[in-house]
Design a protein with these regions (language model features):
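An N-terminally biased module of ancient metal coordination in phosphate/nucleic-acid-related enzymes
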Residues: 65, 92-93
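G-domain G4 guanine-recognition motif of GTPases
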Residues: 85-91
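Short, ordered loop/turn segments at secondary-structure junctions
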Residues: 51, 88, 118
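Short, electropositive alpha-helical surface patch
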Residues: 95-119
């Protein structure tokens, strides 16, 4: 609140309607279960690298990167509502295997999953409605 020219101006008279807050965590080049992420008490959206598949989990450990399943375990540990996999290594040509490995870890959780490629968009309508958009020949597809 503010006093101006003898008039009390109330801050509530100048604010719009309240909006629901949203927490987004973006993690690139990060090992599985990084303390800065797993110490969170929930987040709406975790965007996490998935450089390797499980066959190369030792490489992930050696180079401080994650596998898709490691990103999923991290999502569960930090209480993420939605996980977006990204930042794939050169060996990964399609995201199907990454999705499959992450889905197997997330099977018993409520965390939803998608795999983003370069140029994709993540549309956040509210904390409970996160949509992955990707471009195909004639426009954006959900």
């Amino acid at each position: 609140d503010l006093q101006h020219n003898g008039e009390l101006l109330l801050s509530k008279d100048f604010r719009g309607s309240e909006i629901e807050s949203l927490s987004i965590v973006i993690s690139g080049d990060t090992s599985e279960m990084a303390p800065g992420i797993t110490s969170l008490d929930g987040c709406d959206l975790l965007i996490h690298e998935a450089t390797f598949l499980d066959d190369f989990s030792q490489h992930a450990d050696d180079y401080l990167h994650s596998t898709a399943s490691g990103a999923a375990r991290t999502a569960i540990a930090c209480g993420a509502k939605h996980l977006v996999l990204t930042h794939y290594g050169a060996r990964i040509k399609q995201t199907d295997e990454s999705l499959s490995e992450a889905k197997s870890v997330l099977a018993e959780s409520k965390t939803t999953l998608s795999a983003a490629r370069d140029g994709d968009r993540i549309l956040i309508e509210n904390p409970n409605e996160i949509t992955h958009l990707y471009w195909r020949n004639d426009g954006w597809i959900r």
